[in-house]
Amino acid sequence: MADAQFDSALDLLRRLNPRDTKQNLQAITSIVPDLTEDLLSSVDQPLEIRRCPKTKRDYLLCDYNRDGDSYRSPWSNEFDPPLDDGTVPSERVRRLEVAANEAFDVYRELYYEGGVGSVYFWDLDDGFAGVILLKKGVSPGGKHSGEWDSIHVFEATDRGRMAHYKLTSTVILHLSNENEALGEMDLSGNMTRQIEVDMNVDSDASHVANVGKLVEDMELKMRNLLQEVYFGKAKDVVGELRSIGPLSETNRDRATHQEMIRGLQR
């Protein structure tokens, strides 16, 4: 029964506006509380921002830095609200996490020119795993607004001088535009892609460079795919549905065009 409810919940969420994922999750878990943990760990939702009380720096919230109702800051490695027995990475993995946060902070400034980014690592039996989060918003709540959320989850398995990486990347995008002439348009969606690759590892620092290259390449591919395929198709659909000119003028032009075709066929 629980598996059927879980599958039904996922199917329902796939059919609803990704912009409202958080509210829809709350509604579903209020009806079936037993699904809360499974849904929170399985469903990607727009990232939320919180400020680290110790360092005064913003960081992003997700299921991977959550322990109960507390969230761990990547800058201080402390939980907010405070949690005495919260799960933190080992000393080695924490050093990698700090280095990755510094590297992706530069990446965020270069590629996003602002926004917020956070990186979280945790230990595995034969390596480690992590998540890279990036968020950029434009005029949230205004007539012209947009939000981009990138969630990159990876596993790194050590194999001597090589490491096997498995990366799952998700982009959640929301664009909204409203004006008096054309009305309102809301475009929301998400995309997920995966890749597995073996790469050379000379030292722990190589892991940060390798993951950075994988994320950079994946984001470039997903941006191009969104722009060329999804945005291009959406533009064609909107162009078919909407016309800047009056409907009467469009109908008159269409009638004239059809009359010319009939004249040529005689």
Curated annotation (Swiss-Prot):
SUPFAM superfamilies: Subunits of heterodimeric actin filament capping protein Capz. It holds the Pfam family F_actin_cap_B. Keywords: Actin capping, Actin-binding, Cytoplasm, Cytoskeleton. GO terms for biological process: actin cortical patch organization; barbed-end actin filament capping; cell morphogenesis; filamentous growth; mating projection actin fusion focus assembly; mitotic actomyosin contractile ring assembly; mitotic actomyosin contractile ring contraction. The keyword Cytoplasm applies. GO terms for molecular function: actin filament binding. One of its GO terms (cellular component) is nucleus. It is found in: Cytoplasm, Cytoskeleton, Actin patch; Cytoplasm, Cytoskeleton. F-actin-capping proteins bind in a Ca(2+)-independent manner to the fast growing ends of actin filaments (barbed end) thereby blocking the exchange of subunits at these ends. Unlike other capping proteins (such as gelsolin and severin), these proteins do not sever actin filaments. Belongs to the F-actin-capping protein beta subunit family. Component of the F-actin capping complex, composed of a heterodimer of an alpha and a beta subunit. This is F-actin-capping protein subunit beta. The lineage of its organism: Eukaryota, Fungi, Dikarya, Ascomycota, Pezizomycotina.
